[in-house]
Every structure is written in C-alpha cells, then in structure tokens.
C-alpha cells in the first residue's frame, strides 16, 4: 500500500525536440514541479504528481499521448516510466537538478531554496516554479530573456504584456530590466498563483507586474491602451491562432518576442506575422528552438 503522502514520479526519456511538448503534457496532466536533464543525445524530463491525482490507466494514456507527439514530430518514441515515491524524495529529487543559471548578459536565475549573493554583477531573478513552466533552463525561456535585454529600455517607461506568463519569469525579467509595467495572463489558475508567488519572491509590487487568469480577452480588459511590446512563449500553433487577436493590443511600431517555436515551424510563424501586419526583425536559434523578434507595422 502506498504511503499517505506518495507522489508519482513520471520520467520521459525523449528526443530533444519533444522537450517543450513533454513539459506541456506534464503541466496539463497536473504535475506539480518538473525538471529536465540532458542524457547523451536525449533528454530526461521529470514530472511529479500526488498519487491520488492519477490512476495507472491515466498514466498509460499520458504515455500514449507522448508517443503520438513523437510520431507527429517524426522522432523516436520516448521511453516512459513512472514510480511512486514519498513526499520527501519528490522534493529532493526535483530540486537537486536545478542550480543557479546565468542567462544572457544580464541575468542569473536563483532557485528560491538557494540564498543569492548579497552582491552580483548580474540581475538576480529568484524563482520557485511550482506547477508552472519556466525555470530558466529551457532554450525558449533563455532566448526570450536575452531578447528582452535588447528590447527593454528603462528611460522609455515601457508597458508590456506577457501572454501565457507561466511562472512569471519573463514578466519579472522585464521589470528587473526597467519596464514600467507588465501585464501577465495565463489560463491556468495554479500557474497564476505560482507567478504571483514569484512576483513576491522578487519583491516586485503588484502595480508593476499585474498577473491575472485568462488569455487575450482578459488582457484586453486589463490594458488601458495598446502596449509597447508583447511576449509570448507558448506552442507555435497557439501563437498562430492568437496573432490576429493580440496584434491590436500592441502599438504601431511596437514589438513582439515569440518563442516556443521549433525551427521547422519558423516559416509558419513568419507567414502568420506577415499576414497580420508584422515585420520579422530577427530570428534567434538555439538547439531545435527559435525565437522571433518582430515589429508591428503602422496601423490603418
């Protein structure tokens, strides 16, 4: 019989191109905490879920979805494994794989359970991701933070939007760089809680980083006027669907940072941007992922 505080540890050994999809699957499955570890030519993605939240049949269905994702991406099927561990083992297993991570020229990301130094030549971004995607270790998150280093100009008092804010890491990063205000939305209420916790962890006032549950309609209600820039680090097909909706929320000549995009999906994103009145300024690539920086053309 499992202990009262048992957790499922779910392990997915997969092709690197499946990393973000695997994270997304685990998040939607309800995992509280995820991590990734490089293994030769593969990646080991872990997720943790209270035992009472899933039965064996649920886990088998999750494994099948991951296999279908691999077929879609035309890569080898992942190796899927699950086991029950106690609560203390879960906490240790997840956290031991995550250490302070320098990102770009300006940031260093510190897990909440590691005390940061009193003095640093980098901006210290503290994070406890909980259920949310965005620990700073994924290529797409790093590309977005590095893009923000180029786009955020403190003397311009920029107001930004973060669509699908996850752990809040990108909105927090923007405020640390000098953005006057960031509006973040995510359609997962647990993720919103995580982002608000991280906002507090970084001592950012709620007026400077507004975090609400929702998507584009809620973002439209939050902002008083079009924003200077928008950040969107989610799946490519979702970006294509949402582009017509969020384009009017950005000022003419405003910018967008878009990631969560596989390299082979970049043409579809470029086409969607052009169709919605955007010009691609730069495409940065890392591993199998890319990040678009785009500028909105003058409105009608």
Swiss-Prot record:
CDD domains reported in the protein's UniProt record: AdoMet_MTases (cd02440)
Catalysed reactions, as listed in the record: L-lysyl-[protein] + 3 S-adenosyl-L-methionine = N(6),N(6),N(6)-trimethyl-L-lysyl-[protein] + 3 S-adenosyl-L-homocysteine + 3 H(+)
Subcellular locations according to the entry: Cytoplasm
Binding-site residues for S-adenosyl-L-methionine, renumbered to this chain: 141, 164, 186, 233
EC number: 2.1.1.-
Gene3D superfamilies listed in its UniProt record: Vaccinia Virus protein VP39 (3.40.50.150)
UniProt-recorded Gene Ontology molecular function terms: protein methyltransferase activity; protein-lysine N-methyltransferase activity
Example GO BP: methylation
Keyword terms of this UniProt record: Cytoplasm, Methyltransferase, S-adenosyl-L-methionine, Transferase
Superkingdom of the source species: Bacteria
Any one of the GO CC terms: cytoplasm
Similarity comment: Belongs to the methyltransferase superfamily. PrmA family.
Functional description taken from the UniProt entry: Methylates ribosomal protein L11.
PANTHER family, sorted: ELECTRON TRANSFER FLAVOPROTEIN BETA SUBUNIT LYSINE METHYLTRANSFERASE
Protein name per its UniProtKB record: Ribosomal protein L11 methyltransferase
Gene that this polypeptide is encoded by: prmA
């Amino acid at each position: 019989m499992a202990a009262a505080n048992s957790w499922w540890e779910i392990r997915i050994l997969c092709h690197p191109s499946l990393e973000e999809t695997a994270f997304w699957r685990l998040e939607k499955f309800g995992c509280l905490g995820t991590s990734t570890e490089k293994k030769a030519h593969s990646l080991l993605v872990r997720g943790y879920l209270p035992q009472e939240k899933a039965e064996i049949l649920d886990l088998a269905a999750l494994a099948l979805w991951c296999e279908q994702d691999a077929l879609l991406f035309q890569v080898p099927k992942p190796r899927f494994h699950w086991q029950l561990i106690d609560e203390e083992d879960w906490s240790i297993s997840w956290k031991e794989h995550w250490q302070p991570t320098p990102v770009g020229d300006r940031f260093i990301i510190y897990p909440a359970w590691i005390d940061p130094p009193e003095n640093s030549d980098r901006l210290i971004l503290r994070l406890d991701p909980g259920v949310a995607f965005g620990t700073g270790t994924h290529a797409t998150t790093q590309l977005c933070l590095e893009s923000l280093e180029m786009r955020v100009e403190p003397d311009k008092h920029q107001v930004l939007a973060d669509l699908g804010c996850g752990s809040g890491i990108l909105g927090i990063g923007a405020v640390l760089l000098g953005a006057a205000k960031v509006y973040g939305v995510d359609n997962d209420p647990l993720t919103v809680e995580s982002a608000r916790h991280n906002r507090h962890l970084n001592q950012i006032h709620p007026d400077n980083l507004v975090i609400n549950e929702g998507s584009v309609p809620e973002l439209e209600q939050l902002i008083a006027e079009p924003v200077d820039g928008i950040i969107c680090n989610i799946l490519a097909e979702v970006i294509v669907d949402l582009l017509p909706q969020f384009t009017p929320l950005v000022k003419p000549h405003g910018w967008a940072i878009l990631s969560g995009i596989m390299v082979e999906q970049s043409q579809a994103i470029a086409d969607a941007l052009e169709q919605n009145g955007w010009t691609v300024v730069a495409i940065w690539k890392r591993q199998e992922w890319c990040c678009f920086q785009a500028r909105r053309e003058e409105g009608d």
